[in-house]
Amino acid sequence: MTLQDMQIRLKQAFPDAEIEVIDLTGTQDHWEVFVSSTLFTGRSRIEQHQMVNRAFAEELRTGEVHALSIKTLIRKE
């Protein structure tokens, strides 16, 4: 996935989010994502990370995304 693909996917899953995506190795398969969204309100950190992982479930399954480091924050309205 490209950087733009990652950003689009996150925006689709979290329309209100502030997002930052970093390609950790330059190989487009090791990523770090920062997502701040109101959709995380009332959810545990594990649930927040599961939500982000679901956005990339197929790519993680096939190995297109090999590593995904996730940082989440509950965004205030």
Model-derived regions: residue spans:
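Short edge beta-strands and adjacent turn/loop segments
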Residues: 16-32
